[in-house]
Amino acid sequence: MSPAKKPTKPIFNRIRLLRTERGLSRAQLAEIIGVNVQTVGALERSDHYPSLDLAMNLSEAFQLPIEAIFSRTEFTPMSTQIYQEK
């Protein structure tokens, strides 16, 4: 399961944030989603974008909907979102 080529429109992600929140290493996440460690690094850096299958595996691993992990627009910092909710 290799990442897909980059489309012309960027896809932003929260993979690194979600992985570290859960105390997972890149190697642990790679094992859970069935890819190699380098793929996780490339996804976190947005060097590559995931296939639909890989995006669904990440969604299952983090127990979040895909749109909570990936977006066509930049995510606002979590601290900003939390502050605005109060």
Where are these predicted regions, by residue range?
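Short, Lys/Arg-enriched anionic-surface-contact patches
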Residues: 2-9
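Short amphipathic helical patch at the helix-1/turn junction of helix-turn-helix
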Residues: 9, 20-21, 48-49
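Short basic helix-loop element that most often maps to the first helix and adjoining turn
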Residues: 13-28, 32, 57, 83-85
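Residues in the recognition helix of alpha-helical DNA-binding motifs
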Residues: 18, 32-33, 43, 72
